[in-house]
Amino acid sequence: VSVPYHRMFRVDGRWRWWRPLAAIGVFLGFYLASQVLIAVAWFVPIGVQSGPEGLQRFQESLTSGALDPTDPVVLSMTIVSLVVLLPSIMAAVRIVKLGPFGQLSSVRTRIRWGWMARCLLPLLVLAVIMVGLQSWGTFTVDGSGVHWDTAVLGQSTVTLGTLTLTIVMVVLLVPFQAAAEEYVFRGFLMQTIGAWIPWRRVGAVVAVLVSTAVFAIGHVPNGYNVWGILDVGSFGLIAAVIVLRTGGLEATILQHALNNVTIFVLQAPGWSKVDIEASDGTWQGWLVTLGTSLLYWGLVELVAWRSGLDRRFPGEETPRFRGVAPAWAGGSRWVRPGGSGWSGAPARSEGVAGPVAAHVGASGPVEDAAGVAGRP
């Protein structure tokens, strides 16, 4: 008996259908509050230093659509505003008692660091291919060696200090931004949909489709055209499948972080002949994303097979009761085969439905009002 990743919310004894909805409310509250704090932290210093005109320019840069990696101030605020998705969803899951936050990480209720380390080999292959494809035609070779082709790219429009600051900031912050999006779209959202739908296979399909659609729609404000949205959607679709196939977010966090870091670093010099504000995707770009994502999935599957990865939670789902879960159950799992009892269940009192449990410690009998309602 085991539980797939998208049903992990069903493992905790306190599961109720309304808890994810309550968690969404808490999540939005924390996230919106954090956006206010971030706005104050960035806008106030800019207003003091540059005045109203500086604030207006900053606001225009933030709302221009495509993200400009050559402006460290705008880039830092944008990335941090996404990074806070992670503590917001952590707080929501904990406050609403959906179970341990680690269950969003994997079926082992934690980050599987050993498995993540094994995913570095497929990631390295992906990195070489992505950098090669995205920088194709931008290098030239002459007597002095290999260097950027300025005839194609133009000249860098940023100083060495700005370039260094941008790259350091991207390398340090973008992995957390990528992880935050994975926990929200491929973690919380997929587990919510999967827990609501009683049929596991149907739930898996719907969870993948819904998370992919929401992920793609979330990028519409960036000004992407149809090919750009298809590009993002293809990435999200295959990432969702990888999560279900591996039972965790580790592989997709690495893939997402690599994708974003590569894009930002290659654009950081601000080449004069490259329009970094252009957000229109192309069918060629979509095919590259689709092909590299499929390749990464295949390599991850191979590594998972060779390493004997545990893809499912080694336990059972909490049975569905007609009434309130027993007071002594708390968050304990239903652990005995066939749903014959709660772990750590105290002795049953007269008139309480269910099997007689052995006396546990000095807890005493359960009160009649807190007994287990009859199972369907």
Feature names for model-found ranges:
Residues 81-92, 120-133, 209, 213:
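Hydrophobic alpha-helical transmembrane segments of multi-pass integral membrane proteins
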Residues 24-25, 110-122, 202, 253-256, ...:
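Interfacial aromatic "cap" segments that immediately flank transmembrane helices
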Residues 76-79, 101-180, 190-191, 195-198, ...:
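Juxtamembrane helix-loop-helix connectors linking adjacent transmembrane helices
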Residues 31-47, 51, 90-94, 127-139, ...:
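Short hydrophobic alpha-helical membrane-anchoring segments
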Residues 16-23, 74-78, 82, 115-119, ...:
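Residue-level signature of transmembrane alpha-helical entry/exit and packing/kink sites
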Residues 1-100, 276-376:
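N-terminal, membrane-interfacial amphipathic/helix-forming hydrophobic leader that caps
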Residues 166-324:
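Transmembrane helix-loop-helix hairpins at the membrane interface
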Residues 11-19, 66-74, 107, 111, ...:
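Membrane-helix interfacial "entry" motifs
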